């Protein structure tokens, strides 16, 4: 499950995890810039619409909690920014703060 693409398509990752427990063993974790117009194909997403975790539209915390409950076994931090390293560092700090 790619929570960015799910949210971009007007769906809620938590709802899908709850509805299909065990169906998603892998999760790509990525956030969407606030103000991004949602809908359409995830293939149309621009690189600048991906932001560090916890700063965008996706309820990352809720998705991660649901992932633990409903059978996600592996998480992958996905970052598509041209200068991805600073955003990855910020996302890792966010994840570390969720403990």
Regions found by a protein language model. Name each.
Residues 1, 7-99:
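Histidine-acidic metal/acid-base catalytic patches
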């Amino acid at each position: 499950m790619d929570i960015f693409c799910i949210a971009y398509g007007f769906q809620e990752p938590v709802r899908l995890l709850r509805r299909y427990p065990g169906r998603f063993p892998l999760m790509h974790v990525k956030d969407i810039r606030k103000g991004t117009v949602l809908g359409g194909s995830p293939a149309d997403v621009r690189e600048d619409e991906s932001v560090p975790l916890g700063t965008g539209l996706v309820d990352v915390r809720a998705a991660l909690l649901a992932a633990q409950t409903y059978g996600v076994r592996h998480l992958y931090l996905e970052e598509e920014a041209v200068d991805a390293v600073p955003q990855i560092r910020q996302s890792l700090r966010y994840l570390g703060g969720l403990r």
